[in-house]
Amino acid sequence: MSHQPLSCLTEKGDSSCETPGNGPSNMVHPNLDTFTPEELLQQMKELLVENHQLKEAMKLNNQAMKGRFEELSAWTEKQKEERQLFEIQSKEAKERLKALSHENERLKEELGKLKEKSERPFEDITGRCGFPRTDLEQEVEQLKRQVEQEVEHLKIQVRRLQAEKADLLGIVSELQLKLNSGGSSEDSFVEIRMTEGEAEGAMKEMRNSAGPTRTDSISMGKCTEDARTCVEFEELTVSQLLLCLREGNQKVERLEIALREAKERISDFEKKANGHSAIETQTEGSTQKEEEDKDPESVGIEVETLNVQVASLFKELQEAHTKLSEAELMKKRLQEKCQALERKNSATPSELNEKQELVYSNRKLELQVESMRSEIKMEQAKTEEEKSRLATLQATHDKLLQEHNKALRTIEELTKQQAEKVDKVQLQELSEKLELAEQALASKQLQMDEMKQTIAKQEEDLETMAVLRAQMEVYCSDFHAERAAREKIHEEKEQLALQLAILLKENNDFEDGGSRQSLMEMQCRHGARTSDSDQQAYLFQRGAEDMSWQHGQQPRSIPIHSCPKCGEVLPDIDTLQIHVMDCII
């Protein structure tokens, strides 16, 4: 904030403009002769302290305005979220309508098939009749869940309204405290104005030592403007509170409408549940009827609790309206006080510029608030459109449910008529199946007896096999021992045979050498020589006789490979092993 200087000093020390920079010219100033310089300094210090306090109050008001703006932005975000929830609910309702339409078409197709096949015997009617009943039960459960979800949603909205109401009541109480302290602030403003006049008179007398005091007088002028801005901010806060309370009233009205719609839906669902319970008592019995009667009772209790909450909300809203009227009265009083202050204080050009800036900023804020309101209205219109769509979807849903119920009734009637015809055929078929089952059981019992006998025989065979295996192990061990002993004997016999063969060869060689020497000696003695042919024949015959004699003198070979059990002689050890295994077994 800028102010005109209180005194324009010349080179000689005189003032070129004697008019003060703030305050009217016709205002009577007190005589400064009665005040001492110390008292003037004390008053200046007090004014500085008050100026500092006013600045802090302005900062707090600015922070409060920022908080209000943030709350408004958060509220708009909540509205957007609610709108998204409504859109999701509308989509779900559309999907349910599609599913119901598909089910209705399927039931119509089944009706057509039943009408076409009414002349023929049916075997699987009971299996088909179970599906629509289960579908009906599922739909009833889904509708009950929807009602419970809507009731919970309404409860959440009521809690939100209660919290908002508590916040608004706290804000109103704070404003009342500020307004109660407003009277003392006005008195302080008047005192500030009086001290400003006194300070200006003192400054005219003390021009040479007026360096630091000029800044103090300028700050005094700023205090009045700070007070005006404080009042304007308080007016803005009051107006914003009024808007918030009006919006709260609108929310309560919407909730009342939603509660009425929920009550209507609950009544419709109760009627439908009663209808379904009447149908199910004819088919299933009294147990399910008691379970279905409990659900509407619980829904009715929840509706009564909601009605009580709505009544309490109405009472709280009436109290809020009374507090709003009190706040409006306080606003009028503040406006009157502001007008009185404006009349007292004459505006300078610099103050006018500052006021214009403040007005411009206030208009900007108002435009922002209006834009927010327009957005909120648009969102409210969209939500209302979505509600209307939901209402139309619910109407179509009710129609489809009625058609579904009619189709189910016709199906049940047809199934009852055809069940009476099919009972006799089913009894005959069941009797035949029983006979076949008894025959199959008898044959299976015979097979079981035969299997038991075979199992007993196999167990006996297994026992004998175990004994035989033990005997085989004993025989095998004995056979391996005998085989090892025989192999040793055979090796010894082979060694002896080799030694005999060597000795026989040596003996033959020795005998041949001796016979030749004797022949040579005989030839030399006798000197008679026969012809070569006769001599050769004689020698040949004698050699043959010697060979036969040698063969006659050789020992006969004893049979080695013979069976120990039966005594049969075999040529090889392998054949002997095979024979022994067969002979023992």
From Swiss-Prot:
A Gene Ontology molecular function term of the record: K63-linked polyubiquitin modification-dependent protein binding
Sites where the protein binds Zn(2+): C563, C566, H579, C583
UniProt biased composition (Polar residues): 16-25
Keywords: Autophagy, Coiled coil, Cytoplasm, Cytoplasmic vesicle, Endosome, Golgi apparatus, Metal-binding, Phosphoprotein, Zinc, Zinc-finger
Region of interest: Interaction with MYO6: 416-525
Modified residues (Phosphoserine): S188, S209, S346, S531
Subunit structure: Self-associates. Interacts with HD. Interacts with GTF3A. Interacts with MYO6. Interacts (via UBAN) with ubiquitinated TFRC. Interacts with GTP-bound Rab8 (RAB8A and/or RAB8B). Interacts with TBC1D17. Interacts with TBK1. Interacts with TRAF3. Binds to linear ubiquitin chains. Interacts with LC3 family members MAP1LC3A, MAP1LC3B, GABARAP, GABARAPL1 and GABARAPL2; OPTN phosphorylation increases the association (at least with MAP1LC3B). Interacts with RAB12; the interaction may be indirect.
Protein name stated in the entry: Optineurin
Source organism of the structure: Rattus norvegicus
